[in-house]
Amino acid sequence: MKETENRGRVPRLRFPEFRESGEWETIPLSQLAKRSTQKNNRGELNSVLTNSAEFGVVDQRDYFDKDIATQGNLEGYFVIEKGDYVYNPRISKMAPVGPISKNNIATGVMSPLYTVFRFNNSHNDFFAYYFKTTGWHQYMRQTSSTGARHDRVAVTNGDFMAMPLPVTLLEEQQKIADCLSSLDNLITLEAQKLGALKTHKKGLMQQLFPAEGETVPRMRFPEFRDAWQIRKLEEIADFFKGKGISKADIDPQGQTPCIRYGELYTEYNESIKNVFSRTNVSPSELFLSRANDVIVPASGETKIDIARASCVKLDQVALGGDLNVLRPNIDGLFLSYILNGPAKEEIARTAQGDTVVHLYASQLKLIDLPVPGHEEQQKISDCLSSLDDLITAQAQKVGALKTHKKGLMQQLFPVLDDTPG
């Protein structure tokens, strides 16, 4: 595959055997596919599918963990067969004009709010990949408006089916689809490896820490034999509270590294070795970490979600408001792992609130924890930390492959510059 001059309707990257095949055509969707408007009139189908921006077409029960549509109102739903495509007009950060996805699972029914269509040619994976690019977004923006709810695109059926699509020789279409499919298979394989590592870690943590009501773990390093001691959290840590750092205080060029409580949910795991945010707030107005501190959110959305902890391995990191700061006299990383493992359910039970959940130091102090000697603490935290390093490296590999795929798709399809104004 070689990069070509971006002249006319030609992709930037093209397989060598097609470089002399000329420009691609632009053909309206209506000439390549037909809308599917078959209704579930007798209610014979009860498998309700949905089209999510992240996962594509999935069973509604798997996506929402429950049935959203009820059996009585399925007769007005569209039938969607395996191989059909569906447009969901709901906009999101991942799908700014709504997602178009191919149904690769099974025949089912779709909400009448969706647009279902079927390509004339059954070999159409090429278009499934095209719809994952942003190449068609500009057309949708120019021919539609945001619905009354401000979270949906309003587009007529005629305008939608008039959408221009890039078309080349069937052989080139198939080559592109095969290339991207191979990359998808690689991403799936690496993601499965990542999942296996996470599952292994979860099982290992269950064996390296004593079960509830016990003082000896099921799996133990051979040099250790003494029973673990049950200690209240207030006996092994001093408690502090972080100081507020607003979003406006974040400065990529700031002098002081900082952690805001929301980042515990998105950026960090049990060990914090590198910090992503910085601030220029005066150090005198900040609460600064000592290496080995453990931080726990003071507020969150759900009780189980708030039950998490991270060990800050660095000195002089500003710790934001809404963070409980524990300064332990034991190994902080060990404490972080045990709070995320066997103590997680107990922490969740102590949290208070419904819409916004709070976790107070006074509650955390009373939690009982099984604690071994310092050398065994270190051995356990080193073991789990090494596994975390493998998980991080594998996650970065999966992320890099996804980024590569995204960039490749943008280059394998030409830019359409003749959309209506």
Model features per residue range: what roles?
Residues 1-20, 185, 189-229, 396-421:
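Short amphipathic coiled-coil heptad-repeat segments
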Residues 7-9, 107-113, 145-171, 247, ...:
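A short glycine-rich beta-alpha junction/loop motif
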Residues 10-40, 220-243, 366:
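Non-catalytic DNA-recognition/assembly elements of restriction-modification systems
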Residues 30-41, 52-84, 108, 234-248, ...:
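Sequence-specific dsDNA recognition surfaces
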Residues 42-50, 142-144, 246-254, 350-351:
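Short coil/turn segments at secondary-structure boundaries
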Residues 75-136, 149, 260, 278-341:
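A short beta-sheet element
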Residues 91, 179-181, 300, 383-385:
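Short, surface-exposed secondary-structure boundary micro-motifs
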Residues 172-175, 378-379:
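Short, solvent-exposed linear patches
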